[in-house]
Curated annotation (Swiss-Prot):
Species of origin: Alkalilimnicola ehrlichii (strain ATCC BAA-1101 / DSM 17681 / MLHE-1)
Gene Ontology terms describing biological process: arginine catabolic process; putrescine biosynthetic process from arginine; spermidine biosynthetic process
This enzyme's EC code(s): 4.1.1.19
Protein name: Biosynthetic arginine decarboxylase
Function text: Catalyzes the biosynthesis of agmatine from arginine.
Alphabetical list of PROSITE patterns matching this protein: ODR_DC_2_1, ODR_DC_2_2
The protein's required cofactors: Mg(2+); pyridoxal 5'-phosphate
Amino acid sequence: MSDWSIGLARQVWSVQHWSGGYFDISDEGRVVARPDRDPARAPLDLAGIAAEARHQGLGLPVLVRFLDILHDRVDSLCQAFRQAMVEDGYRGGYRAVYPIKVNQQRRVVEEIIRHGNGRVGLEAGSKPELMAVLALTPPGGTVVCNGYKDREYVRLALRGRQLGLQVHLVIEKASELELVLEEAAALGVTPSLGMRVRLATIGAGKWQNTGGEKSKFGLTAAQALAVVDRLRAAGCLDWLRLLHFHLGSQIPNIRDIRRGMREAARYYAELRALGAPVETVDVGGGLGVDYEGSRSRSFCSMNYTVAEYAHNVVHALWQVCEDEGLPHPDIITESGRAMTAHHAVLITDVIDGDRVPGGADLLAPADAAPRVLHELWTVWTGLDRRHPLEAYHDAAHGLAEAQELYAHGVLNLTDRARAERIWQAVCHALLQRLDPRRRPHRELLDELNEKLADKLFCNFSLFQSMPDVWAIDQIFPVLPLQRLDEPPASRAVLQDLTCDSDGCIRGYVDRDGVESTLPLPPWRPGEPYLLGIFLVGAYQEILGDMHNLFGDTHSVNVRLTGEGYALSGAAHGDTITDVLRYVDFDAEVLRGIYRERVVAAAGLDATARAQCLADLEAGLRGYTYLDT
Protein backbone atom coordinates (compact mmCIF):
# COMPACT_ATOMS: atom_id res chain seq x y z
CA MET A 1 0.00 0.00 0.00
CA SER A 2 2.66 2.48 -1.07
CA ASP A 3 -0.02 4.96 -2.12
CA TRP A 4 -1.27 5.30 1.46
CA SER A 5 -2.15 8.85 2.46
CA ILE A 6 -3.79 10.80 5.24
CA GLY A 7 -6.78 11.25 2.95
CA LEU A 8 -7.16 7.48 2.72
CA ALA A 9 -6.80 7.22 6.50
CA ARG A 10 -9.72 9.63 6.92
CA GLN A 11 -11.78 7.43 4.60
CA VAL A 12 -10.88 4.11 6.24
CA TRP A 13 -11.86 5.31 9.71
CA SER A 14 -14.65 7.58 8.36
CA VAL A 15 -13.39 10.36 10.61
CA GLN A 16 -14.94 13.22 8.67
CA HIS A 17 -18.40 11.68 8.92
CA TRP A 18 -18.73 10.63 12.57
CA SER A 19 -16.55 13.33 14.13
CA GLY A 20 -18.81 16.28 13.37
CA GLY A 21 -15.68 18.28 12.56
CA TYR A 22 -14.35 17.99 16.13
CA PHE A 23 -11.66 15.39 15.37
CA ASP A 24 -9.28 14.83 12.47
CA ILE A 25 -6.02 13.17 11.45
CA SER A 26 -2.99 15.44 11.11
CA ASP A 27 -0.45 15.27 8.30
CA GLU A 28 1.83 13.48 10.78
CA GLY A 29 -0.73 10.69 11.22
CA ARG A 30 -1.89 11.72 14.69
CA VAL A 31 -5.45 12.20 15.90
CA VAL A 32 -6.19 15.82 16.74
CA ALA A 33 -9.15 17.68 18.21
CA ARG A 34 -10.74 20.92 17.04
CA PRO A 35 -13.15 21.60 19.92
CA ASP A 36 -14.54 24.81 18.45
CA ARG A 37 -14.23 23.67 14.81
CA ASP A 38 -12.18 26.77 14.04
CA PRO A 39 -9.75 25.91 11.20
CA ALA A 40 -7.61 28.93 12.12
CA ARG A 41 -6.83 27.53 15.57
CA ALA A 42 -4.05 24.97 15.98
CA PRO A 43 -5.56 21.53 16.63
CA LEU A 44 -4.93 19.66 19.89
CA ASP A 45 -2.92 16.44 19.77
CA LEU A 46 -4.74 13.72 21.74
CA ALA A 47 -1.63 11.67 22.46
CA GLY A 48 -0.03 14.86 23.78
CA ILE A 49 -3.03 15.47 26.04
CA ALA A 50 -2.71 11.92 27.38
CA ALA A 51 0.98 12.52 28.09
CA GLU A 52 0.24 15.76 29.93
CA ALA A 53 -2.50 14.07 31.95
CA ARG A 54 -0.02 11.35 32.92
CA HIS A 55 2.41 14.06 34.03
CA GLN A 56 -0.36 15.29 36.36
CA GLY A 57 -0.70 11.82 37.86
CA LEU A 58 -3.51 10.51 35.66
CA GLY A 59 -2.42 7.31 33.98
CA LEU A 60 -4.41 5.33 31.46
CA PRO A 61 -7.24 4.80 30.96
CA VAL A 62 -8.34 8.42 31.19
CA LEU A 63 -11.58 10.07 30.10
CA VAL A 64 -10.93 13.40 28.38
CA ARG A 65 -13.76 15.93 28.30
CA PHE A 66 -13.53 18.78 25.78
CA LEU A 67 -15.61 21.54 27.34
CA ASP A 68 -15.55 23.69 24.21
CA ILE A 69 -17.26 20.90 22.28
CA LEU A 70 -20.16 21.20 24.73
CA HIS A 71 -20.28 24.92 24.00
CA ASP A 72 -20.27 24.35 20.25
CA ARG A 73 -23.01 21.73 20.46
CA VAL A 74 -25.25 24.16 22.36
CA ASP A 75 -24.53 26.93 19.86
CA SER A 76 -25.17 24.68 16.86
CA LEU A 77 -28.51 23.47 18.19
CA CYS A 78 -29.75 26.94 19.09
CA GLN A 79 -28.56 28.39 15.78
CA ALA A 80 -30.32 25.64 13.82
CA PHE A 81 -33.67 26.43 15.44
CA ARG A 82 -33.13 30.16 15.15
CA GLN A 83 -32.51 29.78 11.42
CA ALA A 84 -35.48 27.45 10.92
CA MET A 85 -37.77 29.94 12.67
CA VAL A 86 -36.50 32.80 10.52
CA GLU A 87 -37.09 30.81 7.34
CA ASP A 88 -40.70 30.00 8.27
CA GLY A 89 -41.50 33.33 9.89
CA TYR A 90 -42.15 31.45 13.12
CA ARG A 91 -43.17 33.76 15.95
CA GLY A 92 -42.54 31.49 18.94
CA GLY A 93 -39.27 31.13 20.82
CA TYR A 94 -36.89 28.23 21.29
CA ARG A 95 -35.18 26.80 24.34
CA ALA A 96 -32.88 23.81 24.53
CA VAL A 97 -33.47 21.79 27.69
CA TYR A 98 -30.74 19.42 28.83
CA PRO A 99 -31.96 16.18 30.48
CA ILE A 100 -29.29 15.60 33.09
CA LYS A 101 -29.82 11.82 33.03
CA VAL A 102 -27.69 11.80 29.86
CA ASN A 103 -24.63 12.88 31.82
CA GLN A 104 -25.08 14.13 35.37
CA GLN A 105 -21.44 15.09 35.91
CA ARG A 106 -21.60 18.47 37.62
CA ARG A 107 -19.00 20.09 35.37
CA VAL A 108 -20.86 18.95 32.26
CA VAL A 109 -24.18 20.35 33.49
CA GLU A 110 -22.57 23.60 34.66
CA GLU A 111 -20.79 24.14 31.35
CA ILE A 112 -23.98 23.65 29.37
CA ILE A 113 -25.95 26.04 31.59
CA ARG A 114 -23.19 28.65 31.80
CA HIS A 115 -22.52 28.75 28.09
CA GLY A 116 -26.23 28.58 27.29
CA ASN A 117 -26.61 31.95 29.00
CA GLY A 118 -30.39 31.75 29.26
CA ARG A 119 -30.85 29.65 26.12
CA VAL A 120 -30.74 26.30 27.95
CA GLY A 121 -32.88 24.83 30.72
CA LEU A 122 -32.62 21.57 32.64
CA GLU A 123 -34.80 18.48 32.88
CA ALA A 124 -35.10 16.14 35.86
CA GLY A 125 -36.58 12.67 35.87
CA SER A 126 -36.18 11.76 39.55
CA LYS A 127 -35.99 13.38 42.98
CA PRO A 128 -32.18 13.28 43.16
CA GLU A 129 -31.95 14.87 39.72
CA LEU A 130 -34.52 17.49 40.71
CA MET A 131 -32.48 18.47 43.77
CA ALA A 132 -29.43 19.01 41.55
CA VAL A 133 -31.44 20.92 38.95
CA LEU A 134 -33.02 23.26 41.51
CA ALA A 135 -29.53 24.27 42.62
CA LEU A 136 -27.88 24.63 39.21
CA THR A 137 -30.65 26.40 37.28
CA PRO A 138 -30.09 30.18 37.34
CA PRO A 139 -32.88 32.49 38.58
CA GLY A 140 -35.74 32.58 36.09
CA GLY A 141 -34.38 29.51 34.29
CA THR A 142 -36.48 26.72 32.82
CA VAL A 143 -36.93 23.39 34.60
CA VAL A 144 -38.92 20.48 33.17
CA CYS A 145 -40.01 17.83 35.70
CA ASN A 146 -40.58 14.41 34.13
CA GLY A 147 -40.65 10.86 35.47
CA TYR A 148 -42.67 9.12 38.17
CA LYS A 149 -43.75 11.47 40.95
CA ASP A 150 -44.78 11.07 44.55
CA ARG A 151 -46.02 13.78 46.89
CA GLU A 152 -42.50 14.83 47.84
CA TYR A 153 -41.44 15.17 44.19
CA VAL A 154 -44.47 17.36 43.46
CA ARG A 155 -43.83 19.50 46.54
CA LEU A 156 -40.18 20.02 45.64
CA ALA A 157 -41.13 21.05 42.11
CA LEU A 158 -43.60 23.59 43.49
CA ARG A 159 -40.91 24.89 45.83
CA GLY A 160 -38.90 25.53 42.70
CA ARG A 161 -41.67 27.86 41.53
CA GLN A 162 -41.40 29.70 44.83
CA LEU A 163 -37.65 30.06 44.26
CA GLY A 164 -38.32 31.96 41.04
CA LEU A 165 -37.69 29.16 38.55
CA GLN A 166 -39.89 28.48 35.52
CA VAL A 167 -40.79 24.95 36.59
CA HIS A 168 -43.00 22.89 34.28
CA LEU A 169 -44.49 19.96 36.19
CA VAL A 170 -45.34 17.38 33.53
CA ILE A 171 -48.25 15.02 34.14
CA GLU A 172 -47.13 11.64 32.79
CA LYS A 173 -49.61 9.46 34.68
CA ALA A 174 -53.23 10.47 35.28
CA SER A 175 -52.86 9.67 38.99
CA GLU A 176 -50.29 12.45 39.40
CA LEU A 177 -52.84 15.19 38.83
CA GLU A 178 -54.58 14.78 42.19
CA LEU A 179 -51.24 15.05 44.00
CA VAL A 180 -50.53 18.29 42.15
CA LEU A 181 -53.95 19.76 42.97
CA GLU A 182 -53.55 18.91 46.67
CA GLU A 183 -49.98 20.15 47.05
CA ALA A 184 -50.58 23.33 45.04
CA ALA A 185 -53.50 24.18 47.35
CA ALA A 186 -51.46 23.37 50.46
CA LEU A 187 -48.55 25.58 49.41
CA GLY A 188 -50.60 28.30 47.74
CA VAL A 189 -48.58 27.92 44.54
CA THR A 190 -49.96 28.17 41.01
CA PRO A 191 -48.09 25.55 38.99
CA SER A 192 -47.27 25.51 35.32
CA LEU A 193 -48.46 22.09 34.23
CA GLY A 194 -47.37 20.05 31.27
CA MET A 195 -49.10 17.04 29.79
CA ARG A 196 -47.16 14.21 28.19
CA VAL A 197 -49.16 12.50 25.47
CA ARG A 198 -48.47 9.10 24.00
CA LEU A 199 -48.15 9.32 20.22
CA ALA A 200 -49.01 6.48 17.86
CA THR A 201 -45.95 7.36 15.80
CA ILE A 202 -42.82 5.35 16.60
CA GLY A 203 -39.31 6.47 15.71
CA ALA A 204 -37.61 3.21 14.65
CA GLY A 205 -34.37 2.43 16.45
CA LYS A 206 -32.85 0.74 19.47
CA TRP A 207 -34.97 2.87 21.80
CA GLN A 208 -38.18 2.93 19.76
CA ASN A 209 -40.35 1.84 22.70
CA THR A 210 -39.48 5.01 24.59
CA GLY A 211 -42.02 6.62 22.27
CA GLY A 212 -45.23 5.44 20.63
CA GLU A 213 -48.17 3.55 22.13
CA LYS A 214 -45.87 1.12 24.03
CA SER A 215 -44.14 3.97 25.80
CA LYS A 216 -43.59 3.63 29.54
CA PHE A 217 -44.81 7.18 30.05
CA GLY A 218 -47.51 9.42 28.66
CA LEU A 219 -51.28 9.73 28.48
CA THR A 220 -53.55 8.11 25.94
CA ALA A 221 -55.98 10.33 24.06
CA ALA A 222 -58.77 9.39 26.49
CA GLN A 223 -56.59 10.08 29.52
CA ALA A 224 -55.55 13.44 28.08
CA LEU A 225 -59.20 14.42 27.73
CA ALA A 226 -59.87 13.27 31.30
CA VAL A 227 -57.03 15.47 32.61
CA VAL A 228 -58.44 18.47 30.74
CA ASP A 229 -61.91 17.78 32.16
CA ARG A 230 -60.56 17.44 35.71
CA LEU A 231 -58.62 20.68 35.46
CA ARG A 232 -61.66 22.47 34.08
CA ALA A 233 -63.84 21.12 36.87
CA ALA A 234 -61.30 22.34 39.43
CA GLY A 235 -61.16 25.77 37.79
CA CYS A 236 -57.50 25.20 36.97
CA LEU A 237 -57.45 24.67 33.20
CA ASP A 238 -55.30 27.78 32.89
CA TRP A 239 -52.51 25.85 34.65
CA LEU A 240 -52.00 23.66 31.56
CA ARG A 241 -49.27 25.51 29.70
CA LEU A 242 -47.08 22.84 28.10
CA LEU A 243 -47.58 19.89 25.76
CA HIS A 244 -44.91 17.21 25.95
CA PHE A 245 -44.26 14.08 23.90
CA HIS A 246 -41.33 11.85 23.08
CA LEU A 247 -40.74 10.26 19.69
CA GLY A 248 -37.86 8.09 20.87
CA SER A 249 -34.13 8.34 21.44
CA GLN A 250 -31.54 8.34 18.65
CA ILE A 251 -34.05 8.38 15.78
CA PRO A 252 -32.12 7.56 12.59
CA ASN A 253 -34.76 8.42 9.99
CA ILE A 254 -36.00 11.98 9.44
CA ARG A 255 -39.28 10.64 8.03
CA ASP A 256 -40.20 9.27 11.48
CA ILE A 257 -39.59 12.70 12.99
CA ARG A 258 -41.69 14.35 10.30
CA ARG A 259 -44.61 11.95 10.85
CA GLY A 260 -44.44 12.27 14.62
CA MET A 261 -44.41 16.04 14.50
CA ARG A 262 -47.53 16.11 12.34
CA GLU A 263 -49.37 14.00 14.92
CA ALA A 264 -48.06 16.07 17.83
CA ALA A 265 -49.01 19.33 16.16
CA ARG A 266 -52.60 18.09 15.99
CA TYR A 267 -52.53 17.53 19.77
CA TYR A 268 -51.49 21.16 20.22
CA ALA A 269 -54.36 22.36 18.03
CA GLU A 270 -56.90 20.14 19.82
CA LEU A 271 -55.81 21.21 23.30
CA ARG A 272 -56.10 24.86 22.30
CA ALA A 273 -59.57 24.14 20.90
CA LEU A 274 -60.54 22.63 24.27
CA GLY A 275 -59.63 25.90 25.97
CA ALA A 276 -56.25 24.91 27.40
CA PRO A 277 -53.86 27.89 27.10
CA VAL A 278 -50.91 25.74 25.98
CA GLU A 279 -48.06 28.06 25.02
CA THR A 280 -45.07 25.70 24.89
CA VAL A 281 -44.51 22.43 23.02
CA ASP A 282 -41.74 20.19 24.38
CA VAL A 283 -40.85 17.74 21.61
CA GLY A 284 -38.61 15.65 23.87
CA GLY A 285 -35.62 13.77 22.52
CA GLY A 286 -34.88 11.95 19.32
CA LEU A 287 -32.19 14.03 17.64
CA GLY A 288 -29.58 11.46 16.69
CA VAL A 289 -25.81 11.16 16.66
CA ASP A 290 -24.06 9.54 13.69
CA TYR A 291 -21.91 7.13 15.68
CA GLU A 292 -20.89 5.09 12.67
CA GLY A 293 -20.59 7.89 10.14
CA SER A 294 -22.70 6.14 7.51
CA ARG A 295 -25.29 8.94 7.21
CA SER A 296 -27.98 6.27 6.94
CA ARG A 297 -31.07 4.84 8.63
CA SER A 298 -28.90 2.40 10.56
CA PHE A 299 -29.80 2.47 14.26
CA CYS A 300 -26.37 3.91 15.15
CA SER A 301 -26.53 6.58 12.47
CA MET A 302 -28.85 9.32 11.19
CA ASN A 303 -29.81 10.38 7.68
CA TYR A 304 -30.32 14.07 8.47
CA THR A 305 -28.54 17.09 9.88
CA VAL A 306 -29.32 19.18 12.95
CA ALA A 307 -30.60 21.87 10.59
CA GLU A 308 -33.00 19.42 8.92
CA TYR A 309 -34.24 18.26 12.31
CA ALA A 310 -34.92 21.83 13.41
CA HIS A 311 -36.70 22.64 10.15
CA ASN A 312 -39.04 19.66 10.46
CA VAL A 313 -39.93 20.44 14.08
CA VAL A 314 -40.57 24.11 13.40
CA HIS A 315 -42.39 23.64 10.11
CA ALA A 316 -44.86 21.08 11.47
CA LEU A 317 -45.97 23.45 14.22
CA TRP A 318 -45.95 26.45 11.90
CA GLN A 319 -48.19 24.62 9.44
CA VAL A 320 -50.89 23.64 11.94
CA CYS A 321 -50.86 27.12 13.48
CA GLU A 322 -51.30 28.76 10.08
CA ASP A 323 -54.06 26.32 9.13
CA GLU A 324 -55.94 26.75 12.41
CA GLY A 325 -55.18 30.41 13.11
CA LEU A 326 -53.37 29.59 16.35
CA PRO A 327 -50.53 31.40 18.12
CA HIS A 328 -47.10 29.93 17.48
CA PRO A 329 -46.00 28.12 20.66
CA ASP A 330 -42.54 28.28 22.12
CA ILE A 331 -40.54 25.13 21.36
CA ILE A 332 -38.46 23.06 23.76
CA THR A 333 -36.25 20.15 22.75
CA GLU A 334 -34.54 17.67 25.07
CA SER A 335 -31.61 16.71 22.84
CA GLY A 336 -29.19 15.58 25.53
CA ARG A 337 -27.41 12.95 23.46
CA ALA A 338 -26.72 15.40 20.65
CA MET A 339 -25.40 17.95 23.16
CA THR A 340 -22.96 15.68 24.97
CA ALA A 341 -21.94 12.60 22.96
CA HIS A 342 -19.06 14.23 21.06
CA HIS A 343 -17.35 15.93 23.98
CA ALA A 344 -15.82 12.89 25.73
CA VAL A 345 -13.05 10.55 24.54
CA LEU A 346 -11.71 7.56 26.44
CA ILE A 347 -7.97 7.16 25.90
CA THR A 348 -6.48 3.78 26.69
CA ASP A 349 -3.53 1.64 25.64
CA VAL A 350 -2.87 -1.85 24.34
CA ILE A 351 -1.22 -4.01 26.99
CA ASP A 352 -0.83 -7.26 25.07
CA GLY A 353 -1.72 -8.94 21.82
CA ASP A 354 -2.40 -12.36 20.35
CA ARG A 355 -1.58 -12.72 16.66
CA VAL A 356 -2.52 -15.60 14.35
CA PRO A 357 0.78 -16.69 12.73
CA GLY A 358 1.26 -16.80 8.96
CA GLY A 359 3.18 -19.28 6.84
CA ALA A 360 6.74 -18.24 7.70
CA ASP A 361 9.00 -21.08 8.89
CA LEU A 362 6.34 -23.66 8.12
CA LEU A 363 7.87 -27.14 7.79
CA ALA A 364 6.51 -30.05 5.75
CA PRO A 365 5.19 -32.95 7.83
CA ALA A 366 7.42 -35.97 8.21
CA ASP A 367 6.71 -39.00 6.02
CA ALA A 368 5.34 -40.86 9.03
CA ALA A 369 3.03 -38.01 10.03
CA PRO A 370 -0.73 -38.70 10.04
CA ARG A 371 -2.49 -38.61 6.67
CA VAL A 372 -4.57 -35.54 7.53
CA LEU A 373 -1.41 -33.43 7.96
CA HIS A 374 -0.20 -34.44 4.48
CA GLU A 375 -3.60 -33.55 3.01
CA LEU A 376 -3.49 -30.13 4.63
CA TRP A 377 0.07 -29.66 3.39
CA THR A 378 -1.08 -30.49 -0.16
CA VAL A 379 -3.68 -27.72 0.09
CA TRP A 380 -1.00 -25.28 1.31
CA THR A 381 1.51 -26.08 -1.44
CA GLY A 382 -1.12 -26.06 -4.19
CA LEU A 383 -2.80 -22.74 -3.46
CA ASP A 384 -1.52 -21.08 -6.64
CA ARG A 385 -3.21 -23.73 -8.79
CA ARG A 386 -6.61 -23.79 -7.12
CA HIS A 387 -9.68 -21.60 -6.80
CA PRO A 388 -9.57 -19.79 -3.42
CA LEU A 389 -13.01 -20.98 -2.29
CA GLU A 390 -12.24 -24.61 -3.14
CA ALA A 391 -8.92 -24.47 -1.31
CA TYR A 392 -10.57 -22.92 1.73
CA HIS A 393 -13.23 -25.58 1.97
CA ASP A 394 -10.65 -28.38 1.68
CA ALA A 395 -8.49 -26.79 4.37
CA ALA A 396 -11.49 -26.29 6.66
CA HIS A 397 -12.44 -29.94 6.20
CA GLY A 398 -8.89 -31.02 7.00
CA LEU A 399 -8.78 -28.94 10.19
CA ALA A 400 -12.15 -30.30 11.37
CA GLU A 401 -10.95 -33.85 10.74
CA ALA A 402 -7.71 -33.22 12.66
CA GLN A 403 -9.65 -31.83 15.63
CA GLU A 404 -11.96 -34.84 15.65
CA LEU A 405 -9.04 -37.28 15.45
CA TYR A 406 -7.40 -35.46 18.37
CA ALA A 407 -10.58 -35.77 20.43
CA HIS A 408 -10.55 -39.55 19.79
CA GLY A 409 -6.89 -39.88 20.77
CA VAL A 410 -5.63 -40.66 17.25
CA LEU A 411 -3.62 -37.42 16.96
CA ASN A 412 -1.40 -36.12 19.72
CA LEU A 413 -1.11 -32.49 20.81
CA THR A 414 1.88 -31.82 18.53
CA ASP A 415 -0.04 -33.16 15.52
CA ARG A 416 -3.02 -30.97 16.32
CA ALA A 417 -0.80 -27.90 16.68
CA ARG A 418 0.78 -28.62 13.26
CA ALA A 419 -2.64 -28.99 11.65
CA GLU A 420 -3.72 -25.64 13.08
CA ARG A 421 -0.51 -23.96 11.87
CA ILE A 422 -1.03 -25.19 8.31
CA TRP A 423 -4.67 -24.08 8.44
CA GLN A 424 -3.66 -20.62 9.63
CA ALA A 425 -1.05 -20.33 6.88
CA VAL A 426 -3.64 -21.29 4.26
CA CYS A 427 -6.05 -18.65 5.57
CA HIS A 428 -3.40 -15.93 5.53
CA ALA A 429 -2.42 -16.80 1.97
CA LEU A 430 -6.02 -16.91 0.76
CA LEU A 431 -6.71 -13.51 2.30
CA GLN A 432 -4.18 -11.98 -0.10
CA ARG A 433 -5.80 -13.71 -3.12
CA LEU A 434 -9.39 -12.64 -2.51
CA ASP A 435 -10.84 -9.65 -4.35
CA PRO A 436 -13.50 -7.66 -2.45
CA ARG A 437 -14.90 -6.45 -5.78
CA ARG A 438 -15.97 -10.00 -6.64
CA ARG A 439 -19.23 -10.94 -4.96
CA PRO A 440 -18.36 -14.64 -4.41
CA HIS A 441 -15.22 -13.56 -2.53
CA ARG A 442 -16.81 -11.08 -0.13
CA GLU A 443 -18.34 -13.50 2.35
CA LEU A 444 -15.11 -15.49 2.65
CA LEU A 445 -13.10 -12.28 2.92
CA ASP A 446 -15.21 -11.14 5.89
CA GLU A 447 -14.91 -14.57 7.51
CA LEU A 448 -11.13 -14.67 7.12
CA ASN A 449 -10.70 -11.12 8.39
CA GLU A 450 -12.52 -12.16 11.55
CA LYS A 451 -10.68 -15.49 11.96
CA LEU A 452 -7.24 -13.96 11.42
CA ALA A 453 -7.76 -10.75 13.36
CA ASP A 454 -5.26 -9.95 16.08
CA LYS A 455 -6.65 -9.96 19.60
CA LEU A 456 -5.52 -6.78 21.32
CA PHE A 457 -5.99 -6.60 25.07
CA CYS A 458 -6.69 -3.05 26.20
CA ASN A 459 -6.50 -1.33 29.56
CA PHE A 460 -10.17 -0.58 30.20
CA SER A 461 -13.46 -2.19 31.17
CA LEU A 462 -16.11 -2.23 28.47
CA PHE A 463 -18.79 -2.61 31.15
CA GLN A 464 -17.57 0.51 32.98
CA SER A 465 -16.72 2.82 30.08
CA MET A 466 -18.87 1.59 27.15
CA PRO A 467 -21.78 -0.35 28.69
CA ASP A 468 -24.02 0.23 25.66
CA VAL A 469 -21.67 -1.92 23.56
CA TRP A 470 -22.52 -4.88 25.77
CA ALA A 471 -26.16 -3.98 26.37
CA ILE A 472 -27.43 -2.96 22.92
CA ASP A 473 -24.56 -3.49 20.45
CA GLN A 474 -23.93 0.24 20.28
CA ILE A 475 -21.18 1.38 17.92
CA PHE A 476 -18.48 3.81 19.07
CA PRO A 477 -15.68 4.93 16.73
CA VAL A 478 -12.25 3.61 17.73
CA LEU A 479 -8.89 4.44 16.18
CA PRO A 480 -5.22 4.65 17.12
CA LEU A 481 -4.04 8.08 18.20
CA GLN A 482 -0.71 7.74 16.36
CA ARG A 483 0.90 6.09 13.31
CA LEU A 484 -2.06 6.76 11.03
CA ASP A 485 0.42 7.77 8.34
CA GLU A 486 1.14 4.03 8.11
CA PRO A 487 -1.21 1.72 6.19
CA PRO A 488 -3.52 -0.48 8.29
CA ALA A 489 -1.70 -3.73 7.56
CA SER A 490 -3.56 -5.71 10.21
CA ARG A 491 -7.05 -6.13 11.56
CA ALA A 492 -7.89 -6.59 15.21
CA VAL A 493 -10.59 -7.27 17.76
CA LEU A 494 -10.31 -5.29 21.00
CA GLN A 495 -10.70 -7.09 24.31
CA ASP A 496 -11.03 -5.42 27.70
CA LEU A 497 -9.54 -6.42 31.07
CA THR A 498 -12.57 -8.20 32.49
CA CYS A 499 -12.80 -11.96 32.92
CA ASP A 500 -15.85 -12.03 30.67
CA SER A 501 -16.13 -13.09 27.05
CA ASP A 502 -18.62 -10.25 26.53
CA GLY A 503 -15.83 -7.78 27.30
CA CYS A 504 -15.09 -7.43 23.62
CA ILE A 505 -15.94 -4.80 21.02
CA ARG A 506 -17.61 -6.62 18.13
CA GLY A 507 -18.50 -3.76 15.78
CA TYR A 508 -16.15 -1.12 14.32
CA VAL A 509 -16.54 1.86 12.04
CA ASP A 510 -14.88 0.96 8.73
CA ARG A 511 -15.31 3.35 5.81
CA ASP A 512 -19.07 3.80 5.27
CA GLY A 513 -20.21 0.87 7.37
CA VAL A 514 -19.56 -1.38 10.32
CA GLU A 515 -17.25 -4.40 10.33
CA SER A 516 -16.46 -7.10 12.89
CA THR A 517 -12.75 -6.19 12.96
CA LEU A 518 -10.83 -2.92 13.18
CA PRO A 519 -8.16 -1.99 10.59
CA LEU A 520 -4.97 -0.90 12.37
CA PRO A 521 -1.30 -0.22 11.85
CA PRO A 522 0.36 -3.35 13.27
CA TRP A 523 0.79 -3.47 17.03
CA ARG A 524 4.42 -3.98 18.03
CA PRO A 525 5.10 -5.52 21.46
CA GLY A 526 6.94 -3.20 23.80
CA GLU A 527 5.92 0.00 22.00
CA PRO A 528 3.22 2.35 23.35
CA TYR A 529 0.00 1.97 21.38
CA LEU A 530 -2.72 4.45 22.32
CA LEU A 531 -6.33 4.08 21.27
CA GLY A 532 -9.13 6.63 21.39
CA ILE A 533 -12.75 5.58 21.89
CA PHE A 534 -14.92 8.46 20.74
CA LEU A 535 -18.46 9.82 21.26
CA VAL A 536 -18.78 8.34 24.75
CA GLY A 537 -20.11 11.55 26.36
CA ALA A 538 -23.77 10.49 26.55
CA TYR A 539 -25.02 7.92 29.09
CA GLN A 540 -21.84 5.82 29.29
CA GLU A 541 -20.40 7.25 32.52
CA ILE A 542 -23.57 6.96 34.53
CA LEU A 543 -24.61 3.56 33.14
CA GLY A 544 -21.17 2.01 33.65
CA ASP A 545 -20.94 -0.81 36.19
CA MET A 546 -18.15 -2.37 38.22
CA HIS A 547 -17.83 -5.81 36.66
CA ASN A 548 -14.72 -7.45 38.17
CA LEU A 549 -14.55 -4.34 40.39
CA PHE A 550 -13.05 -2.12 37.71
CA GLY A 551 -14.12 1.34 38.81
CA ASP A 552 -14.42 4.83 37.40
CA THR A 553 -11.49 5.88 35.25
CA HIS A 554 -9.42 9.00 35.74
CA SER A 555 -10.91 12.05 34.02
CA VAL A 556 -9.75 15.50 33.04
CA ASN A 557 -11.27 18.54 31.32
CA VAL A 558 -9.69 20.33 28.37
CA ARG A 559 -10.43 23.99 27.77
CA LEU A 560 -9.18 26.14 24.92
CA THR A 561 -7.05 29.15 25.86
CA GLY A 562 -5.38 31.95 23.96
CA GLU A 563 -2.12 30.01 24.06
CA GLY A 564 -3.60 26.62 23.15
CA TYR A 565 -5.32 24.63 25.85
CA ALA A 566 -5.30 23.93 29.57
CA LEU A 567 -6.18 20.85 31.59
CA SER A 568 -8.44 21.35 34.60
CA GLY A 569 -10.70 19.44 36.93
CA ALA A 570 -8.40 16.43 37.10
CA ALA A 571 -10.24 13.68 38.97
CA HIS A 572 -8.58 10.46 40.01
CA GLY A 573 -10.52 7.30 39.27
CA ASP A 574 -11.59 4.78 41.86
CA THR A 575 -8.95 3.17 44.01
CA ILE A 576 -9.17 -0.45 45.01
CA THR A 577 -10.29 0.71 48.46
CA ASP A 578 -13.12 2.69 46.82
CA VAL A 579 -14.54 -0.22 44.85
CA LEU A 580 -14.19 -2.65 47.73
CA ARG A 581 -16.18 -0.23 49.89
CA TYR A 582 -19.04 -0.36 47.34
CA VAL A 583 -19.38 -4.08 48.03
CA ASP A 584 -19.08 -3.72 51.80
CA PHE A 585 -15.41 -4.51 52.33
CA ASP A 586 -13.91 -2.21 54.96
CA ALA A 587 -10.29 -1.33 54.19
CA GLU A 588 -9.40 -1.10 57.88
CA VAL A 589 -10.74 -4.59 58.50
CA LEU A 590 -8.72 -5.87 55.54
CA ARG A 591 -5.58 -4.18 56.85
CA GLY A 592 -6.08 -5.88 60.19
CA ILE A 593 -6.37 -9.28 58.51
CA TYR A 594 -3.27 -8.61 56.41
CA ARG A 595 -1.27 -7.66 59.52
CA GLU A 596 -2.32 -10.82 61.35
CA ARG A 597 -1.39 -13.01 58.40
CA VAL A 598 1.94 -11.30 57.83
CA VAL A 599 2.86 -11.81 61.47
CA ALA A 600 1.79 -15.46 61.31
CA ALA A 601 3.57 -16.16 58.01
CA ALA A 602 6.43 -18.61 58.46
CA GLY A 603 9.84 -17.91 56.98
CA LEU A 604 9.56 -14.11 56.83
CA ASP A 605 12.03 -11.99 58.73
CA ALA A 606 11.20 -8.51 59.99
CA THR A 607 12.31 -6.82 56.76
CA ALA A 608 10.30 -9.18 54.57
CA ARG A 609 7.24 -8.76 56.78
CA ALA A 610 7.45 -4.98 56.53
CA GLN A 611 7.82 -5.12 52.74
CA CYS A 612 4.94 -7.58 52.40
CA LEU A 613 2.66 -5.36 54.47
CA ALA A 614 3.75 -2.28 52.51
CA ASP A 615 2.85 -4.01 49.22
CA LEU A 616 -0.59 -4.93 50.53
CA GLU A 617 -1.15 -1.36 51.74
CA ALA A 618 -0.11 0.01 48.36
CA GLY A 619 -2.49 -2.41 46.66
CA LEU A 620 -5.44 -0.94 48.53
CA ARG A 621 -4.46 2.56 47.43
CA GLY A 622 -3.88 1.60 43.79
CA TYR A 623 -5.88 2.30 40.62
CA THR A 624 -8.22 -0.53 39.63
CA TYR A 625 -6.70 -0.63 36.13
CA LEU A 626 -3.24 -1.81 35.11
CA ASP A 627 -0.12 0.30 35.57
CA THR A 628 1.41 0.84 32.13
